[in-house]
Amino acid sequence: MRVLVCKDYDGMSKKAAEMIAAQIVLKPNSILGLATGSTPVGMYRDLVKKYNDNIVDFSDVMSFNLDEYYKLPISNDQSYDYFMKENLFNHVNIKPENTHLPNGMADDIEKECMNYEASIDAAGGIDVQVLGIGRNAHIGFNEPDTKFAKRTHVVELTESTIEANARFFKSREDVPKKAVSMGIGSILKSKKILLLASGEEKADAVYNTVYGDITPEVPGSILQLHKDTIVIVDEAAASKLNPKDYKLV
């Protein structure tokens, strides 16, 4: 696990976008694992700029998103399908048929989970997986005590996650109580992982992910065992780390 510390959120976003762009230049048909939420918005903004500046071409890229809310129509402006179109897909030349999210509206949700996992494997696996991290160190929607071997599955969201996501909805009651998420086992199959975090409220989660015991109580801690994980954080999120353990960029 390598840790890169940037001055602020914009610096973190630019560094992550640089790494994604470099991956696409190196392998134009890269398979990207993408995340939603407020953390990667700046990264997507910078990737769109790189596309507009003819630095990166998404025409052969394929993507698989980490998660989607359960039984929230994709037409809803809080669905992750909607988020991805608004923040990235509608602004670059990625082919719609090459973008994939779990279908939270599927009638047979267990079959959908198995099919989604199989689709990732059939594509050749994820080259670079982007992750955010929750205050409780959840990755994807894998909450504390999720088994590390878990593959794509239906998740009951914790009260803290519902509370954190309530700011995106009209009211707390509107936040879905379940989601479909890649499992930790799915995430660990990725060839490279970029974990992004910003803000002082993420400092404990980052500390426990980097230094803590590897335990399901801290889902991010399993990334210590991944062969190529890069943690990209701003100074506030890195505030509890020992400076000798990271590189300022």
UniProtKB/Swiss-Prot annotation:
One of its GO terms (biological process) is carbohydrate metabolic process. Disulfide bonds: none annotated. The active site is at D67 (proton acceptor), N136 (for ring-opening step), H138 (proton acceptor), E143 (for ring-opening step). It catalyses: alpha-D-glucosamine 6-phosphate + H2O = beta-D-fructose 6-phosphate + NH4(+). It comes from the Bacteria. One of its GO terms (cellular component) is cytoplasm. InterPro entries: Glc/Gal-6P_isomerase, Glucosamine6P_isomerase, NagB/RpiA_transferase-like. The keyword Hydrolase applies. GO terms for molecular function: glucosamine-6-phosphate deaminase activity; identical protein binding. PANTHER family: GLUCOSAMINE-6-PHOSPHATE ISOMERASE. Catalyzes the reversible isomerization-deamination of glucosamine 6-phosphate (GlcN6P) to form fructose 6-phosphate (Fru6P) and ammonium ion. Belongs to the glucosamine/galactosamine-6-phosphate isomerase family. NagB subfamily. This is Glucosamine-6-phosphate deaminase. The lineage of its organism: Bacteria, Bacillati, Bacillota, Clostridia, Peptostreptococcales. The gene is nagB.
